[in-house]
Amino acid sequence: MTQTLAAALVPKAELHVHIEGVASPDLVRELADQHGVDVSGLFAEHGSYAWTDFAQFLAAYDTASRVFRTPQDYARLAETYLRSIALDGAIYAELTISPDHAAASGLSYADYVGGLAEGIARAQAATGIEARMIAVGVRHFGARAVEQVARQVATQPHPLVTGFGLAGDETEGHPANFARAFRMAAEAGLGLTAHAGETAGAESVTAALDFLQVSRLG
């Protein structure tokens, strides 16, 4: 037995992956052509995504996300990704989802989650892998936008959406600004997580723990 095969046989869990971020350049190009979305400047000469720092990465992420326009697009994305990691031995995944990015493409929260849930179900039927979703607000969109995501998740519960979090540019907004959103999510029974310590120091981690009452840091 080769080491590669042996590694694939070990059961694994993927606990931190942003669903739009798993899209391959080929898929993004295909959907951009299909939906007539301008993605100029998104790719480097050799075909990969073009970014050199975290701010450019976030901009590239936003651009690539715009090509997903229908629930079927998201079902395809979720199914393709989950099937791929199942081949590597994954039996469980938690997908970070961004209702703000879906809304920017004209999708309602219900259609967005419904499309992803369909893809999850298809992947599970094919491979046995299970998945759940963590809905995140984007901190550089502002506290009001993050609260809107928390409100959507709380008032439109879905059995596969089990968590709420905070993502985006860590330099935009102190965690205290988002405490209300996290209280709303906690009252709805959701698990809480936040990105902290990526581009800021240890004080960002401390603030996330103090003001957001998270049980996990990403």
Identify the function of each model-found stretch.
Residues 1-190, 199-204, 209-211, 215-216:
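Metal-cofactor-binding active-site regions of metalloenzymes
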